């Protein structure tokens, strides 16, 4: 018994592939798997299809969530229970499900709300690596709606986490580090009141949306 699934990057006939893959004995439903993948994407982890570190980080996140000494395994895909009778095998790319094999049920599992699942996953991680519940409940808005004084979550690629900073200005026609920043909002992450913040390219927000701090 279980809620089994296999996750792989092999696009064709996974049960005959020697591609490194992982096995989930529990929480193999699509809603849980999408939450695990979304969490890794938010963390900025390298995708498994491009870097073995991606598999390591995915296993780390899922293993922390389950705890214990079972529930997750890693092996060549052909050695795993791909045609498991539960959720089959998910093919993943860039932290998204892009293909499915051996799924024989009419309906997908949708028992878990994505936000609540992300919060549960986050709480199971080491404290220093957690986003915090407020991050997941924060309102996400397009960057063209930002105003000076807004406090937002900004991704820190070195620590793979988000930190809070205030929007303090918008780029002008002057190029920064060789790139145009006209109209792009920037925050007070690197710099000070004397030098300002517009000079550092790492202060500019380049994502389509951003989360507002409460």
Language model features: what each stretch is:
Residues 161-176:
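Short beta-strand-centered aromatic/proline hotspots
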Residues 39-136:
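Low-complexity intrinsically disordered segments
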Residues 183-214:
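Intrinsically disordered, low-complexity, charged/polar segments
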Residues 134-148:
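Mixed-charge, Lys/Arg-rich low-complexity intrinsically disordered regions
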Residues 4-9, 90:
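Short beta-strand scaffold segments in enzyme catalytic cores
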Residues 1-6, 22, 26-32:
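His-enriched metal-coordination microenvironments in redox/metal-binding proteins
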Residues 173-186:
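Short, solvent-exposed secondary-structure boundary/capping segments
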